[in-house]
Amino acid sequence: MPKIFFLPHKLLLPKGGCFECKEGETILNVALKNNIKLEHACEKSCACSTCHCIIRKGFLSLSGWSEKEEDVLDKAWGLESTSRLSCQAIIGNIDIEVQIPLYNTNYIIEN
């Protein structure tokens, strides 16, 4: 069973965390199931970038991304070459390491 390692996040997960997950789950579902309140303003419909995350290890083991996800990711704050929308990234059979950016587009607009 693969594991997902969330790096420490100042507000959502100060000490980081490691959780077992099932192959085929999305990063967002694993986060929510483990009480990580990762924002997802569009309710997992690939219409916003609030669930943006950066994959630090295991990027190539995730599902491929769609053109729609790529277009939405272009609007994400702090975009990197290994960025994914956590609502779309499906976990494979390899452990991954995920960084949740300190800010997301909603935070920047609202604050």
From Swiss-Prot:
GO molecular function terms listed in the Swiss-Prot or TrEMBL record: 2 iron, 2 sulfur cluster binding; electron transfer activity; metal ion binding
Cofactor binding mode and count: Binds 1 [2Fe-2S] cluster.
Every 2Fe-2S ferredoxin-type domain range: 1-104
SUPFAM superfamilies documented for this protein: 2Fe-2S ferredoxin-like
CDD domains linked: fer2 (cd00207)
Named cofactor requirement(s): [2Fe-2S] cluster
This protein's UniProt keywords: 2Fe-2S, Electron transport, Iron, Iron-sulfur, Metal-binding, Transport
Pfam families: Fer2
Gene3D superfamilies assigned to the protein according to its UniProt record, in alphabetical order: 3.10.20.30
InterPro entries: 2Fe-2S_ferredoxin-like_sf (IPR036010), 2Fe-2S_ferredoxin-type (IPR001041), Adrenodoxin-like (IPR001055), Adrenodoxin_Fe-S_BS (IPR018298), Beta-grasp_dom_sf (IPR012675), Fdx_isc (IPR011536)
UniProt keyword Electron transport, yes or no: yes
One of the GO BP terms on file: P450-containing electron transport chain
Cellular component GO terms, alphabetical: cytosol
Keyword Metal-binding: yes
Residues annotated for [2Fe-2S] cluster binding in this entry: C42, C48, C51, C87
Task of the protein: Ferredoxin are iron-sulfur proteins that transfer electrons in a wide variety of metabolic reactions.
Protein family (similarity comment): Belongs to the adrenodoxin/putidaredoxin family.
Protein's UniProt name: 2Fe-2S ferredoxin
Native organism taxonomy: Bacteria, Pseudomonadati, Pseudomonadota, Gammaproteobacteria, Enterobacterales
